[in-house]
From Swiss-Prot:
Protein name from the UniProt record: Elongation factor G 1
The encoding gene: fusA1
Binding site for GTP: 17-24, 81-85, 135-138
InterPro entries reported for this sequence: EFG_II, EFG_III, EFG_III/V, EFG_IV, EFG_V, EFG_V-like, EFTu-like_2, G_TR_CS
MF annotations from Gene Ontology: GTP binding; GTPase activity; translation elongation factor activity
Organism: Geobacter metallireducens (strain ATCC 53774 / DSM 7210 / GS-15)
Keyword Cell division set for record: no
GO BP, one annotated term: ribosome disassembly
Family according to the record: Belongs to the TRAFAC class translation factor GTPase superfamily. Classic translation factor GTPase family. EF-G/EF-2 subfamily.
Job description of the protein: Catalyzes the GTP-dependent ribosomal translocation step during translation elongation. During this step, the ribosome changes from the pre-translocational (PRE) to the post-translocational (POST) state as the newly formed A-site-bound peptidyl-tRNA and P-site-bound deacylated tRNA move to the P and E sites, respectively. Catalyzes the coordinated movement of the two tRNA molecules, the mRNA and conformational changes in the ribosome.
Amino acid sequence: MARLVPLEKTRNIGIMAHIDAGKTTTTERILYYTGVTHKIGEVHEGAATMDWMEQEQERGITITSAATTCNWGDHRINIIDTPGHVDFTIEVERSLRVLDGAVAVFCSVGGVEPQSETVWRQADKYGVPRIAFVNKMDRVGADFFRGVSMIRDRLKANPVPIQLPIGAEDTFKGVVDLVEMKAIVWDEESLGAKFHVEEIPADLQELAQEYHEKMVEEISSHDDALMEKYLGGEELTVDEVRAAIRNATIAIQICPVICGSSFKNKGVQNLLDSVVEYLPSPVDIPAIKGVDADSGAEIERKAADSEPFAALAFKIMTDPFVGQLCFIRVYSGVLNSGSYVYNSTKGKKERIGRLLKMHANKREEIKEVLAGDIAAAVGLKYTTTGDTLCPEDAPVILESIEFPEPVIAIAIEPKTKADQEKLGISLQKLASEDPSFRVRTDEETGQTIISGMGELHLEIIVDRLMREFKVEANVGKPQVAYRETVTKKVKVEGKFVRQSGGRGQYGHVWIEMEPQEPGKGYEFVDAIKGGVVPREYIPAVDKGIQEAMDTGVLAGFPCVDFKVSLVDGSYHEVDSSEMAFKIAGSMAFKEAAAKASPVLLEPIMSVEVVVPEEYMGDVIGDLNSRRGRIMGMEGRAGAQVVSAMVPLAQMFGYATDLRSATQGRATYTMTFDHYEQVPKSVSEEIIAKVKG
């Protein structure tokens, strides 16, 4: 099948912003103007095409990133709508990973809001070129110029307005195009679909001239040939200006700024024009790098149909009609439906059942997907988010998507017996969709523990269990996984003897127990001389100790980081057995652990808080009050980064506390670092609580 749309006319873009800046509304309008929908879905009526999960329509926020395809002129645009809430940063990360460019939507009243900072930094991390769209120009308090200066000051970006608004609030009726130096005014009756071009209004001519000069000066500074022309006083042609804006945008030297009001249908067509004119096609960005699955050598895959096939799975979704959908971004080559591919990350073969082009929540079946495109595949059994798909004879592993470790865990239990079976299956399904959500069973209590990125994240998961899977569940309080260890060397005896008529039991050992370096784990050394304990019984002693160490002597937490040497013992010709030595081993462990000055260990988290200068003192004071140790501070893009080591037990509710202490402008990441001894006073409290 021939290509319908050439690669250079394909755009893979994301729409990113803070909650409520108008992301989903903007996407809806794009779909309306590109002729995909005939009726506009309003978010506040709960009918937006992109927000198709029930919770999204209720809460009016976007949780999963739906991928949609539309055409504008002779270009094809694949749009990924991303959520703006901090607990769903994982969704944003994974969509940015597979995009070529992005539209950052800002609210003309709120300007740069906290989540805009987070999302902007994520886009910097993946080197995604962006256009800024200052939305809601019709709102009371709308201020385009303040929005632009906030992008400069808060995001440390280089915003270059290529449009100016004509009017603001209820008088907002058009924009000045600074490239062509014309005014574009919308006709209200046509839902903003029609507009006419006229001369720039007299009261704006001076301002427009000033901003036109600024724009030309900025783009010339990145292009020597233009600089010469500009300094020589020559006029630049419209095409030269456009090409220069495009090059500087793709090189992330500037961020063009345009404005409009999606809700009032103003400026959306200009936004589409800008996407096509200034954002990169798959050909304009560097070829994707990966490693050869066999040799580990670095290889490149260029965006071309003739290259070997390579794609990255960036999202798994359960669809009520077709089952599991796997969204893939094809970087090179061609994939046909019904063909076999190789998942190089897992080392498994997969068959592609069907290929679908997604439109928010409608789907169109396609026969093949080509380089640079995004599609959903049905029928993949092993593939999860971040896996690479390729042919078996040209294996490559593309750089995967990094997922943060979950930081909050709660126990969950089914309300009824009937819910019990469904709970396990449903949780596994949800975990396959969302890599930042984990499920495990606590060995000691038998409880199911779910962990995720934050309180809202887990709330939505529990909510989805009820709605999609009809499972009723009770959830507990968040909890910490403690450990125990020993601090001095001891030698003890373990003796298990039962001899009262008939076959008896006889196991007898002497062990030495000593602490190991943190993180070394458990080590067993056989130091028996002269066969005082026969060979065949030695593994049984080891097994007995391993079984006993799962429940420590202090508070029943697993015991870690110690070494046991089996040094002596005795046996009985008839009565000795593996069982007897296993019991002797576990008895010896219990006695040794109690004598070797046992202590409690707690997980210490490495916490990084990105905080605006003015809240720094409060944040540091708060971390200190949580038994935290400040490890360092550094300035980064208009904010301070504070790194600290803090016990996990002190971090519950931190997201909420941090949000209120900094008006939501700080963000934090938390990853497990190591286990450390709990201070005596705290340890006594914990033990008392457990023994209750």
